[in-house]
């Protein structure tokens, strides 16, 4: 199993106070962090607030609400898929929720990951999507699974990459 370090989370994590970044490319879906003073250079000693070792492999972006950061992650072989909650200020892992266990993971190209889609936060739920392996809604505070759907089967060719969005209520 490979260790992936969260060295540089999106610019929303650099800001001094927790923000609301609920989906891929932010609250408006346009990637605008609403701050022209954001750093553009990073290193181990420059503009890095924290880093946390996270075993697994994932390309998804983090989402943020109420001082908590949510990410998705998966074993490199695709047999287990998680939602992970981290503390905004310290990077400490608060929750690691096993969302899906798969008997036969679909092929994933080595340049991709089983946890590529970014989660989305709406209200008091965080939605995680792993393509053909399933979609689930978790309670934002407890991490408990509210519902799951595993009936959408398709051949992603290299694995799922599209991030979910919410539409109305």
Task: Please describe what each predicted stretch is.
Residues 8-16:
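Hydrophobic h-region of N-terminal signal peptides that target proteins for export
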Residues 15-169:
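Noncatalytic, solvent-exposed loop/strand surfaces
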């Amino acid at each position: 199993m490979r260790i992936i370090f969260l060295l540089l989370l999106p610019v929303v994590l650099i800001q001094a106070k927790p923000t609301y970044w609920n989906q891929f490319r932010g609250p408006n879906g346009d990637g605008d962090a609403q701050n022209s003073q954001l750093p553009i250079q990073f290193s181990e000693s420059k503009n890095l607030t924290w880093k946390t070792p996270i075993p697994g492999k994932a390309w998804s972006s983090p989402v943020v609400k109420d001082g908590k950061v949510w990410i998705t992650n998966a074993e490199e072989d695709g047999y287990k898929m998680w939602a992970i909650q981290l503390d905004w200020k310290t990077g400490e892992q608060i929750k690691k929720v096993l969302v899906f266990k798969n008997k036969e993971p679909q092929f994933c190209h080595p340049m991709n990951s089983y946890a590529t889609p970014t989660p989305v936060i709406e209200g008091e739920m965080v939605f995680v999507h792993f393509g053909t392996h399933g979609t689930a809604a978790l309670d934002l505070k407890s991490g408990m699974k509210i519902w799951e759907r595993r009936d959408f089967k398709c051949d992603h060719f290299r694995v799922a990459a599209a991030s979910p969005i919410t539409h109305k209520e």
